[in-house]
Amino acid sequence: MKKTTLKFAALTLLGLSNLALADAASELQMRLAKVDVLSAEFVQTVTSGSGKNVQQGSGKLQIKRPNLFRMETKTPQETQIISDGKTLWFYDPFVQQVTAQWVKNAVNNTPFVLLTSNDNSHWHQYTVTQQSDTFVLKPTLSTSNIKQFDIRVDANGILRNFSTTEKDGQTNLYVLRNITNQTLSDSLFQFKPEKGVEVDDQRKK
Protein backbone atom coordinates (compact mmCIF):
# COMPACT_ATOMS: atom_id res chain seq x y z
CA MET A 1 0.00 0.00 0.00
CA LYS A 2 2.87 2.34 0.89
CA LYS A 3 4.59 1.74 -2.47
CA THR A 4 1.33 2.43 -4.30
CA THR A 5 0.89 5.70 -2.38
CA LEU A 6 4.45 6.80 -3.14
CA LYS A 7 4.03 5.94 -6.82
CA PHE A 8 0.78 7.89 -6.98
CA ALA A 9 2.41 10.88 -5.29
CA ALA A 10 5.31 10.79 -7.74
CA LEU A 11 2.96 10.64 -10.71
CA THR A 12 0.92 13.51 -9.27
CA LEU A 13 4.01 15.68 -8.87
CA LEU A 14 5.14 14.82 -12.39
CA GLY A 15 1.73 15.76 -13.73
CA LEU A 16 1.73 19.07 -11.87
CA SER A 17 5.25 19.80 -13.12
CA ASN A 18 4.25 19.17 -16.75
CA LEU A 19 1.15 21.33 -16.26
CA ALA A 20 3.26 24.18 -14.86
CA LEU A 21 5.62 23.98 -17.85
CA ALA A 22 2.67 24.04 -20.26
CA ASP A 23 1.12 27.00 -18.43
CA ALA A 24 4.40 28.94 -18.54
CA ALA A 25 4.80 28.33 -22.27
CA SER A 26 1.20 29.39 -22.92
CA GLU A 27 1.60 32.51 -20.78
CA LEU A 28 4.79 33.49 -22.62
CA GLN A 29 3.23 32.98 -26.04
CA MET A 30 0.15 34.95 -24.98
CA ARG A 31 2.26 37.89 -23.78
CA LEU A 32 4.42 37.95 -26.90
CA ALA A 33 1.31 37.83 -29.11
CA LYS A 34 0.01 41.08 -27.58
CA VAL A 35 2.52 43.14 -29.59
CA ASP A 36 2.48 42.61 -33.35
CA VAL A 37 5.24 45.08 -34.23
CA LEU A 38 8.23 46.29 -32.23
CA SER A 39 11.32 48.38 -32.93
CA ALA A 40 13.96 49.09 -30.32
CA GLU A 41 17.58 49.90 -29.76
CA PHE A 42 19.52 47.45 -27.64
CA VAL A 43 22.62 47.41 -25.49
CA GLN A 44 24.45 44.08 -25.49
CA THR A 45 26.60 42.85 -22.62
CA VAL A 46 28.71 39.71 -23.00
CA THR A 47 29.70 38.06 -19.73
CA SER A 48 32.10 35.13 -19.40
CA GLY A 49 31.29 31.98 -17.47
CA SER A 50 33.32 33.38 -14.57
CA GLY A 51 31.13 36.51 -14.45
CA LYS A 52 33.56 38.91 -16.13
CA ASN A 53 32.23 41.48 -18.61
CA VAL A 54 34.16 40.81 -21.79
CA GLN A 55 32.33 42.94 -24.37
CA GLN A 56 29.76 45.71 -24.81
CA GLY A 57 27.79 46.29 -27.96
CA SER A 58 24.74 48.03 -29.37
CA GLY A 59 22.31 47.74 -32.22
CA LYS A 60 18.71 47.67 -33.35
CA LEU A 61 15.95 45.07 -33.08
CA GLN A 62 12.85 44.93 -35.30
CA ILE A 63 10.17 42.24 -35.09
CA LYS A 64 6.84 41.74 -36.80
CA ARG A 65 4.44 38.93 -36.07
CA PRO A 66 4.23 36.34 -37.26
CA ASN A 67 7.75 35.07 -37.94
CA LEU A 68 9.58 38.22 -39.09
CA PHE A 69 12.75 39.16 -37.21
CA ARG A 70 15.70 41.49 -37.80
CA MET A 71 18.56 42.18 -35.41
CA GLU A 72 21.44 44.42 -36.43
CA THR A 73 24.47 44.73 -34.20
CA LYS A 74 26.25 48.03 -34.93
CA THR A 75 29.12 47.89 -32.44
CA PRO A 76 31.70 46.57 -31.78
CA GLN A 77 31.28 44.82 -35.15
CA GLU A 78 28.40 44.97 -37.59
CA THR A 79 26.37 41.77 -38.02
CA GLN A 80 22.81 41.03 -39.11
CA ILE A 81 20.38 38.23 -38.24
CA ILE A 82 17.29 38.33 -40.46
CA SER A 83 14.32 35.98 -40.69
CA ASP A 84 11.70 36.19 -43.44
CA GLY A 85 9.74 33.42 -41.75
CA LYS A 86 11.30 30.59 -43.75
CA THR A 87 15.01 31.38 -44.02
CA LEU A 88 17.29 32.68 -41.30
CA TRP A 89 20.22 34.73 -42.57
CA PHE A 90 23.42 35.42 -40.61
CA TYR A 91 25.36 38.18 -42.37
CA ASP A 92 28.83 39.50 -41.52
CA PRO A 93 29.51 42.55 -43.72
CA PHE A 94 33.13 42.83 -42.55
CA VAL A 95 34.13 39.48 -44.08
CA GLN A 96 31.40 39.59 -46.75
CA GLN A 97 29.92 36.24 -45.74
CA VAL A 98 26.34 35.11 -45.13
CA THR A 99 24.91 31.81 -43.88
CA ALA A 100 21.38 30.73 -44.80
CA GLN A 101 19.42 28.16 -42.79
CA TRP A 102 15.84 27.02 -42.74
CA VAL A 103 14.19 28.59 -39.69
CA LYS A 104 12.78 25.22 -38.63
CA ASN A 105 16.32 23.84 -38.44
CA ALA A 106 17.83 26.89 -36.73
CA VAL A 107 15.49 27.24 -33.73
CA ASN A 108 17.51 24.75 -31.67
CA ASN A 109 20.57 27.04 -31.66
CA THR A 110 18.94 30.39 -32.45
CA PRO A 111 15.98 30.83 -30.10
CA PHE A 112 15.57 34.52 -31.06
CA VAL A 113 13.03 33.45 -33.68
CA LEU A 114 10.67 32.33 -30.90
CA LEU A 115 10.02 36.01 -30.17
CA THR A 116 7.75 36.13 -33.24
CA SER A 117 6.85 32.48 -33.82
CA ASN A 118 3.44 30.85 -33.41
CA ASP A 119 4.71 27.50 -34.70
CA ASN A 120 4.25 24.75 -32.11
CA SER A 121 7.05 22.71 -33.68
CA HIS A 122 9.42 25.55 -32.74
CA TRP A 123 8.13 25.88 -29.18
CA HIS A 124 8.27 22.13 -28.57
CA GLN A 125 12.05 22.36 -28.87
CA TYR A 126 12.17 24.16 -25.49
CA THR A 127 10.79 23.74 -21.99
CA VAL A 128 9.56 26.96 -20.38
CA THR A 129 9.44 28.01 -16.73
CA GLN A 130 8.25 31.35 -15.37
CA GLN A 131 9.74 33.57 -12.67
CA SER A 132 7.47 36.64 -12.52
CA ASP A 133 8.05 38.52 -15.82
CA THR A 134 11.08 36.41 -16.74
CA PHE A 135 10.66 33.19 -18.71
CA VAL A 136 13.46 30.64 -18.83
CA LEU A 137 13.62 28.43 -21.91
CA LYS A 138 15.84 25.35 -22.05
CA PRO A 139 16.38 23.27 -25.20
CA THR A 140 15.03 19.74 -25.18
CA LEU A 141 17.79 18.51 -27.51
CA SER A 142 21.30 17.91 -26.15
CA THR A 143 22.76 18.94 -29.53
CA SER A 144 21.91 22.60 -28.90
CA ASN A 145 24.77 25.04 -28.29
CA ILE A 146 22.46 27.00 -25.99
CA LYS A 147 22.10 26.17 -22.29
CA GLN A 148 19.13 28.49 -21.83
CA PHE A 149 17.31 31.48 -23.29
CA ASP A 150 15.76 34.03 -20.93
CA ILE A 151 12.99 36.42 -22.01
CA ARG A 152 11.70 39.28 -19.86
CA VAL A 153 8.33 40.48 -21.10
CA ASP A 154 5.72 42.26 -19.01
CA ALA A 155 1.99 41.51 -18.75
CA ASN A 156 1.26 44.06 -21.51
CA GLY A 157 3.50 42.18 -23.93
CA ILE A 158 6.35 44.70 -23.88
CA LEU A 159 9.67 42.95 -24.40
CA ARG A 160 12.24 44.37 -21.96
CA ASN A 161 15.30 42.18 -22.43
CA PHE A 162 16.44 38.73 -23.44
CA SER A 163 19.62 36.73 -23.04
CA THR A 164 21.30 33.55 -24.21
CA THR A 165 23.51 31.42 -22.00
CA GLU A 166 25.87 29.08 -23.82
CA LYS A 167 27.06 25.72 -22.52
CA ASP A 168 30.38 27.22 -21.42
CA GLY A 169 28.49 29.71 -19.26
CA GLN A 170 29.00 32.76 -21.47
CA THR A 171 25.95 35.03 -21.42
CA ASN A 172 24.77 37.53 -24.04
CA LEU A 173 22.29 40.00 -22.53
CA TYR A 174 20.27 42.36 -24.75
CA VAL A 175 18.51 45.21 -22.92
CA LEU A 176 15.97 47.14 -25.01
CA ARG A 177 15.35 50.89 -24.96
CA ASN A 178 13.50 53.48 -27.07
CA ILE A 179 10.80 50.91 -27.83
CA THR A 180 8.19 51.85 -30.45
CA ASN A 181 5.34 50.04 -32.19
CA GLN A 182 5.35 51.83 -35.53
CA THR A 183 4.43 49.99 -38.72
CA LEU A 184 7.29 48.09 -40.36
CA SER A 185 7.54 47.15 -44.03
CA ASP A 186 7.95 43.46 -44.84
CA SER A 187 10.88 44.43 -47.05
CA LEU A 188 12.97 45.02 -43.91
CA PHE A 189 12.89 41.29 -43.32
CA GLN A 190 14.07 40.28 -46.77
CA PHE A 191 17.72 39.58 -47.51
CA LYS A 192 19.37 39.39 -50.90
CA PRO A 193 23.14 38.83 -50.94
CA GLU A 194 25.01 41.54 -52.79
CA LYS A 195 27.50 40.73 -55.50
CA GLY A 196 30.75 39.51 -53.99
CA VAL A 197 29.18 38.14 -50.80
CA GLU A 198 30.12 34.52 -50.09
CA VAL A 199 27.00 32.45 -49.38
CA ASP A 200 27.01 29.34 -47.19
CA ASP A 201 23.61 27.92 -48.07
CA GLN A 202 22.91 25.22 -45.50
CA ARG A 203 19.37 24.80 -46.80
CA LYS A 204 20.79 22.57 -49.53
CA LYS A 205 22.49 20.20 -47.09
Swiss-Prot record:
One of the record's GO cellular component terms: outer membrane-bounded periplasmic space
Q: Does the keyword Signal apply?
A: yes
Any one Pfam family match given in the protein's UniProt record, by short name = LolA
Chief location of this protein within or outside the cell: periplasm
UniProtKB keywords: Chaperone, Periplasm, Protein transport, Signal, Transport
User: Which processes are annotated in GO (biological process)?
Assistant: lipoprotein localization to outer membrane; lipoprotein transport
Q: Which residues form the signal peptide?
A: 1-22
Q: What does the UniProt entry say about where the protein is found?
A: Periplasm
Q: Where are the transmembrane segments?
A: none
The record's function comment reads:
Participates in the translocation of lipoproteins from the inner membrane to the outer membrane. Only forms a complex with a lipoprotein if the residue after the N-terminal Cys is not an aspartate (The Asp acts as a targeting signal to indicate that the lipoprotein should stay in the inner membrane).
Could you say which protein family the record assigns here?
Answer: Belongs to the LolA family.
Question: What is annotated about its quaternary structure and interactions?
Answer: Monomer.
Q: Which HAMAP family match?
A: LolA
The cross-references to PANTHER family, in alphabetical order and at most eight, read: OUTER-MEMBRANE LIPOPROTEIN CARRIER PROTEIN
Q: Kindly provide the name given to this protein in its UniProt entry.
A: Outer-membrane lipoprotein carrier protein
From which source organism is this entry?
A: Haemophilus influenzae (strain PittEE)
> What is the phylogenetic placement of the source species in the record?
Bacteria, Pseudomonadati, Pseudomonadota, Gammaproteobacteria, Pasteurellales
- Gene name for this UniProt entry: lolA
